[in-house]
């Protein structure tokens, strides 16, 4: 990203304006020869408590548990005598065992109070300077000695080396007895085989059917049912379509019957979901219609009966009017 694309603060803008007045341009360095810095110094907020030169990746590279084990093991000597086994501590190593990475600078004898380096000693005649090694020798020797002090580096092995040392055994204890823990993988393979046996054939049939449809799209006089019958694929399209049509007819009949009943009563009923009684009545009416279609003679008699029934309530109304 260029410096222009980054949002600049008000202080940065003010400083650039002042520099432009004196002939400065973006991309040029400071100074008479223009060989200075080209970008302004930006403040970085320090959010941790680490000091200068701290390596945050040291916790991943330094195996402190390995170092502590090897350090304690090297400070102990085990000897077998006639009386038995004796364990003694080595007197030469007085340094404490810690989980921090050992460094040569911390163990330097010239360090005073753990923070200052001794440079000279005061005598009556003057100062006696301390001889210091050259910078090149000290840098090379310090790096090598730091690696020697790190006892965990001696046991850094790759996975292949560890497998060879362990004789091909893995971490779990069952591998020592020849158990490879492959039961889960075998179960997964069996599940995949069963799945392919069930659904793989159907997918193949569907693919063949789609290919057949694509081939026969341009042919005249070919229906989908004919294609399915030629291939021998079991389909229920015709059966499902006929059932769907029957259901539509039944719904239309029920709606027409409801409208007729509402017109006879003189008011329109609100559209509500049919109850159980309404469903039963509709079924009875359908059965009656079927009987009428089967026996045409009964159809002629029914209107007379219905007319008689329609006349009876009129007579009752007349009687009521007379009584009034």
Curated annotation (Swiss-Prot):
GO terms for cellular component: nucleolus. One of its GO terms (molecular function) is nucleic acid binding. Residues 1-30, 123-324 are annotated as: Disordered. Residues 131-141 have a biased composition (Low complexity). Disulfide bonds: none annotated. Residues 11-57 form the G-patch domain. Residues 296-309 have a biased composition (Polar residues). Residues 14-30, 186-215, 254-270 have a biased composition (Basic and acidic residues). Pfam families: G-patch. PROSITE patterns: G_PATCH. This is G patch domain-containing protein 4.
